[in-house]
Regions:
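N-terminal cap/lid segment of alpha/beta-hydrolase-fold proteins
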Residues: 20, 25-46, 84-143
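The feature captures the conserved acid-bearing segment of alpha/beta-hydrolase catalytic domains
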Residues: 260-263, 278-315
C-alpha cells in the first residue's frame, strides 16, 4: 500500500477547536492505531477553508470540521463531516458520513471510518425511503451463498451514534467468510419506539434480496442497546414465522432487561426517552421489547459480556443467561477480560471466542472456516483510553 493511499487529510474551519495541540494529539493516536499518516490543516479564514477543502478533495476522501451549520463543497460522497456538538444530520451529497455530537473524540471515529471505507469498502443498500433506512453490505471473496451476519449498533437509541460503531466487526466477519449487513435505523426525534423496532425488522427481512446471502444461516448480532433490538427482532421473527428468521442471536454487552435499565436510569434515562414512558406507564411495550421478558426466544443464543464492563451491564447479561438457561432455549454465556467495547474489538480475546462460537453454530462441520484475511496497514483500532458511547 503506497504512502499517499494511507494519508488522511483533515481540514478544520477557523475556531472549531479550543486547543489545537489536543486535537493534534488525538488525531495522531487515531492515525497510529491504523498505521496511517495524516495532514491537518487549520484554516485561518473562510477563503482558506475553501482552498483546503478543494485541495483535499483532489486527493480522495477527506475529513472536514466546517463548524456548526456551515456548508462546504465536495464531490459526491467525498467527505466525512465532523461536528463536535449536537446538530441536525448533514444530508448533502458531499458528506458520505456525518459524525456529530461525539465531542472532540469524533475525530477518532472519523479516522476509523476513513480507514474502513478506504481499505474495506461496502455497498449501501436502502430498505426504505428515509436516509437512515439503510445498510452497508460487504460480501466475501469466493463463491456463495454465504452465511450472513446482521449487525445492530448501540448508542442508547440516540441519533449521534450510527452504524460506523460496528464497522470493525463487519470487516472482520466478512474476512471470516460471512456476508455482513450493517444496519442503520431511525432514532430519536419524531422516530419513536415502534419506528425503531419496525426498521430493524424490515432490515432483517431485506437480507432475502442479497443473492449471495444464505438466509437459512443468518446470525443477528447486536451490541449494547443494539442487542436489545437484535434479540427482540429475533423473538418477533420467530413468533410471527417471518420469511427470514435468525438461526442464532448474539448479545454483546446487551441491554437485556429494559425495566431494570430504566429503573436504574442507565444512559441518563435513555430507556424512558426512547420508549416514551417509564415501565409503570407502559408495561405492555416494555414486555414486548425487553429480551428477558420474551424468553424463550425459540432459537440458540450467545450472551457475551466482558468482566470489567459496567456492573449493571454485566449483571443484565448474567441475569438473562440464567433465565434463558431455565427455558428450552439453547444459550451459551461467554465472558472474558475487557470493558464494554472489548466485545466489539476484532483484536480481543473475547471476540475471537465469540467468532469461534458463531462458526460452530452456523457453519457445517465439514466446511473449513477461513481465517480472517490479511488486512492492509493493520492497526489495533480505537485507543481504549479515549471516550466511548454509552450502550
Amino acid at each position: 500500500v503506497t504512502e499517499p493511499a494511507c494519508r488522511v487529510d483533515i481540514v478544520f474551519a477557523p475556531g472549531v477547536v479550543a486547543h489545537r495541540g489536543t486535537a493534534e494529539e488525538l488525531v495522531g493516536r487515531a492515525l497510529d492505531a491504523r498505521s496511517l499518516t495524516g495532514e491537518l490543516t487549520f484554516a485561518a479564514d473562510t477563503a482558506g477553508l475553501e482552498r483546503a477543502v478543494r485541495s483535499a478533495a483532489r486527493r480522495g476522501e477527506f475529513v472536514v470540521v466546517p463548524g456548526a451549520g456551515a456548508s462546504f463543497t465536495a464531490p459526491a460522497g467525498g467527505a466525512i463531516r465532523v461536528d463536535f456538538g449536537e446538530c441536525e444530520a448533514d444530508r448533502s451529497a458531499g458528506a458520505r458520513v456525518h459524525i456529530r455530537g461525539r465531542g472532540l473524540d469524533g475525530l477518532r471515529y472519523a479516522v476509523d471510518s476513513w480507514y474502513h471505507h478506504r481499505f474495506h469498502p461496502g455497498r449501501i443498500v436502502r430498505y426504505g425511503d428515509h436516509p437512515d433506512q439503510r445498510v452497508e453490505l460487504r460480501i466475501p471473496d469466493g463463491d456463495g451463498p454465504f452465511p450472513v451476519v446482521v449487525l445492530i449498533h448501540g448508542g442508547f437509541w440516540r441519533p449521534r451514534w450510527e452504524s460506523d460503531l460496528m464497522d470493525a466487526l463487519a470487516v472482520d466477519l466478512t474476512a471470516r467468510g460471512y456476508v455482513t449487513w450493517n444496519v442503520e435505523y431511525r432514532r430519536g426525534g419524531e422516530n419513536r419506539w415502534a419506528t425503531i423496532a419496525s426498521d430493524v425488522a424490515d432490515a432483517v427481512q431485506a437480507v432475502a434480496t442479497v443473492p449471495s446471502a444464505d438466509p437459512e444461516r443468518l446470525v443477528i448480532l447486536g451490541h449494547s442497546a443494539g442487542a436489545q433490538l437484535a434479540l427482540r427482532a429475533a423473538a418477533d421473527a420467530t413468533a410471527e414465522e417471518a420469511a427470514v428468521r435468525p438461526a442464532l442471536a448474539v448479545s454483546l454487552a446487551g441491554v437485556l432487561n429494559l425495566r431494570l435499565a430504566g429503573e436504574r436510569h442507565l444512559g441518563e434515562g435513555a430507556v424512558a426517552d426512547a420508549v416514551g414512558s417509564d415501565w409503570a406507564g407502559d408495561r405492555a411495550t416494555y414486555e414486548r421489547s425487553s429480551p428477558i421478558a420474551r424468553l424463550p426466544l425459540g432459537i440458540p443464543q450467545l450472551v457475551v459480556c466482558a468482566v470489567d464492563d459496567e456492573p449493571d451491564m454485566l449483571e443484565m447479561s448474567r441475569e438473562y443467561h440464567e433465565a434463558a438457561a431455565a427455558t428450552p432455549d439453547d444459550v451459551v454465556r461467554i465472558e472474558g477480560p475487557g470493558d464494554h467495547f472489548t466485545v466489539v474489538d476484532p483484536e480481543s480475546e473475547i471476540w475471537r471466542r465469540t467468532a469461534e462460537a458463531i462458526d460452530a453454530r452456523i457453519r457445517p462441520r465439514t466446511t473449513p472456516t477461513p481465517p480472517p484475511a490479511a488486512r492492509p496497514r493493520p492497526g489495533r483500532g480505537a485507543d481504549p483510553r479515549t471516550s466511548r458511547p454509552s450502550s
